């Protein structure tokens, strides 16, 4: 009966037509969000969800929002940069389908590049340290990439040196994510605007792990151009800590795309803090992510606790399934029924 009365009242409203239009638009928009047909896989990159943490955020009026970059088709934030580097090089006439592409990677960029290379018809050669997870290696090979390993001791510096040498010998086109401006350009044109729109301009702090520094450089550049100040916080491992995807670069290997003036503060994150926060995100927030994402949220928690009323945005770089073989989600890390 109540429903009938409400319907009758609604039908007698003078703005009934406007209500119909709004209702139909909302329905159409929700349907669009649920299932959108696209012509190519690359059209599904970006426009990732921004989710508010419900249980980990401090009770001081601050908010922590995380951008779920694992929702990209190859599973990480690096999908954006990979697409940008290849598409922009194509526009300049530097590469064409059938060419050999070379890149040094710690994992996620390699997977993303392998996906785009498969999609567009390139041959992909990827160089990485041999201590990266088996899941990452398998994903690259699944996309058809050739994987070349350097030793753990050589690390990413060794992988970068070998990639450069291969390029100089004419073995392929080096994309060079560490010095390629098309890397941060992807985040200047997509990630930054998305965050600004999704927070309705309320963001006060942006927190990002620093690997190639492409994400923090591009997002920061965009946010600096908006009408309100936003504090930019970068994260690097503490001395002696090892966090996949985050680096404490020696001066001679600092990525050329990095602009220190775009970062207000750099926090040191211990490996244990990153891993513990990663597991807490899974157990308490239902967000299954990788170690560098745990580091980003650990940094965001520091910022939020120290800044009541802050609106903090952090990047969830990838998904946790790429780290299962490393033991970071082993049973020994969880107490029965309680999680951590």
What is each PLM-predicted segment?
Residues 11-25, 29-340:
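PLP-dependent amino-acid enzyme catalytic core
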Residues 4-7, 95:
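Short N-terminal alpha-helical targeting/association segments
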């Amino acid at each position: 009966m109540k429903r009938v009365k409400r319907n009758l009242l609604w039908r007698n409203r003078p703005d009934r037509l406007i209500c119909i239009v709004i209702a139909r638009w909302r329905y159409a928009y929700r349907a669009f969000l649920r299932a959108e047909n696209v012509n190519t896989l690359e059209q599904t990159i970006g426009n990732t969800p921004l989710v508010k943490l419900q249980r980990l955020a401090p009770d001081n009026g601050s908010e922590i929002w995380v951008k779920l970059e694992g929702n990209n088709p190859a599973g990480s934030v690096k999908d954006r940069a990979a697409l940008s580097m290849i598409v922009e090089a194509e526009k300049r006439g530097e590469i064409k389908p059938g060419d050999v592409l070379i890149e040094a990677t710690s994992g996620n960029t390699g997977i993303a590049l392998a996906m785009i290379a498969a999609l567009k018809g390139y041959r992909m050669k990827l160089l990485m340290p041999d201590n990266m997870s088996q899941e990452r290696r398998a994903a690259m090979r699944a996309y058809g990439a050739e994987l070349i390993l350097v030793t753990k001791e050589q690390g990413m510096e060794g992988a970068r040196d070998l990639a450069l040498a291969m390029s100089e010998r004419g073995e392929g086109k080096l994309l060079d994510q560490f010095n390629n401006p098309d890397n941060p350009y992807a985040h200047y044109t997509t990630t930054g605007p998305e965050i600004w729109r999704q927070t309705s301009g309320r963001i006060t702090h942006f927190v990002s792990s620093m690997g190639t520094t492409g994400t923090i450089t591009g997002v920061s550049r965009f946010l600096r151009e908006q009408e309100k100040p936003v504090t930019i916080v970068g994260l690097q491992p503490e001395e002696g800590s090892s966090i996949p995807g985050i680096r404490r670069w020696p001066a001679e290997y600092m990525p050329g795309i990095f602009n220190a003036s775009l970062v207000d503060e750099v926090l040191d994150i211990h490996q244990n803090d990153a891993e513990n926060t990663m597991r807490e995100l899974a157990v308490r927030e239902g967000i299954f992510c990788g170690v560098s994402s745990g580091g980003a949220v650990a940094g965001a928690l520091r910022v939020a606790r120290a800044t009541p009323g802050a609106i903090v945005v952090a990047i969830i770089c990838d998904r946790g399934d790429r780290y299962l073989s490393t033991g970071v989600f082993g049973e020994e890390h969880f107490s029965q029924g309680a999680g951590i």
